[in-house]
C-alpha cells in the first residue's frame, strides 16, 4: 500500500442526504456547496417564477415540479478534505434509485422538517441505511418557522427510527422568536439572522452559556435555554464517536437551511466524525480502500445528462486503489478491457475530465450500452461487488405508441431507461406490448416525459392486470422448461435477460408456487447476477 493512497483515502468523505419530500434536502445540498465555496450563489429550489433552479436539480421534470428525481453527484473540497455528496431523489416513488445510491456512500445526512417530524420516506430510507449500519448525522430543519417541541422531536426519532439521539446544538426559540442555537460541546451560542446569502463568518458568536451578554440580548429566552439544556444533558445521550460509527447513535443539529444557519456545524461534523471509505464486500473477499490496485462498482446509470449529446453515463464508486486517466481497466462481467480516457468527475451536471480518483470518489464512465448497474471494474482481478439489488416492482403499465413508425425509438428509449434503473422493463413471452414495472406512479410520469423530450416518442400507458412480479430460477433446466411451457402467458424477460413471473393477483402467485415447488421465486435480484 502506498502512503499516497492511504493519505488520499483518509481525506475522503462520501455521504448522501436523505429525507422525506419537502423537508428541505435540496436546499441544504445547495447551502453545503455554497459554504464549501463550490458555488458562488445558491439556486432557489422550486424557483418557478425567478427562473433560478437548484444546482442539483437538472432534469426538465425536476425543474417543473421542484423535486429531485435523479440522484446528482457533487464533489467539492472543504478543510483539506475531498467531499463526495450524493443528492438522492426525495420523492417517495424513487425509493429504488435512492436505495442504490445508499450502497455507494459511507455515511448519510438525514434532514427532518421540524414542523412535521419523522415522515414515511424518512423511515424507509433509514431502514435501508440500517441494513449496512451506515452512520447518520441528523439535521432538524426550518427553525425559522413554527415547529414542534424539540424534545418531542428527539423522542420521536428514537421511538420510530430506533436510533439514539445525541443533541450537539440546541435551538433558542423558533419562528419569529428564533434567536439561534447553543453548541453544547463548544459552549458557544450562534446568533441567528434571517437571509439566504450569509456566510458562516457573518453569524455572531457569544462564548459561554453563562455570559452576562446573553441577559442583555434576550432576557426572556436565556433562562428557558439554561433550563432546557439542563434537562437535555440529564435525559439525552452524550455524543460517542464509536456508537455513531456503528450506526447506533446520531448527532443532532438544529437550524434553518434556507437561511444558511446551522450548515457549517453539519459540514464540520461530517469532516471530523464521518468515516473515511471503508472496506467493501465482493463475492471472493473484502476489498480494502487502501489496496494499491484500482477497483469499483456501478451503482447508477443516467441517460442524457446532456440532451445535446444523447449520452449515457455510468456512475462508478471507487472502492480501492487509484484511478488515473488513460489507465486500462477491466469490465469484469463481459471480460473486456477499456482505456479510461473520457472518464469524468461531477459537479451536478457540470462535468470535468477525471485525472485521478481514489476510494470514495464517484467517477462517470461513458456508456454505449455495455455497462449495467451492479457491474464491477478492476485492473484485472475477478471481483464482483455485492449488495446492489433490484426490487420486485409494485405497479405495472403496458406501453403503446401513438405513431407506430416510432417503435424503434420506443424500444431504444425503454431499453436505456431500463438499464438506468428509472423503470423496469418486461417483454412478455406472449403478446406484443412491453410491460413497465415501478415502485411508484411518478416513475411512469418521468418515463413519459423523458421518452417525449429525449427520444421524440409519445407513449401511452395503460393499466396492466398484474399484481406483482417475481424473478424465477431453477437448477433443473428440464423442470424450468416445463414451467415455462405451462405458464407462458404469465412469463416475461426483463432488461437483464432474466425470466420473471407476472402474477395477476396474490392468490395466483401462491397457487403457482405450490404447484411448482422446485422453482424459486425471487422478490429481489442482485444487479450483477443473472439468475
Swiss-Prot record:
Fetch the Pfam families from UniProt.
Answer: EF-G_D2, GTP_EFTU, RF3_C
The record's principal subcellular location, in a coarse class, is cytoplasm
Where on the tree of life does the source sit, at the highest rank?
Bacteria
Keyword set includes Protein biosynthesis: yes
The UniProt entry's GO biological process terms, in alphabetical order, are: regulation of translational termination
Keywords in alphabetical order:
Cytoplasm, GTP-binding, Nucleotide-binding, Protein biosynthesis
Q: Keyword check for Secreted, yes or no.
A: no
What residues does the tr-type G domain cover?
10-278
Mind telling me which InterPro entries this protein's record contains? EF-G-like_DII, EFG_III/V, G_TR_CS, P-loop_NTPase, PrfC, RF3_C, RF3_dom_3_sf, RF3_GTP-bd
Question: Where do the annotations place GTP binding?
Answer: 19-26, 87-91, 141-144
Task: Please state which protein family the record places this protein in.
Answer: Belongs to the TRAFAC class translation factor GTPase superfamily. Classic translation factor GTPase family. PrfC subfamily.
General function of this protein? Increases the formation of ribosomal termination complexes and stimulates activities of RF-1 and RF-2. It binds guanine nucleotides and has strong preference for UGA stop codons. It may interact directly with the ribosome. The stimulation of RF-1 and RF-2 is significantly reduced by GTP and GDP, but not by GMP.
* Protein's recorded name: Peptide chain release factor 3
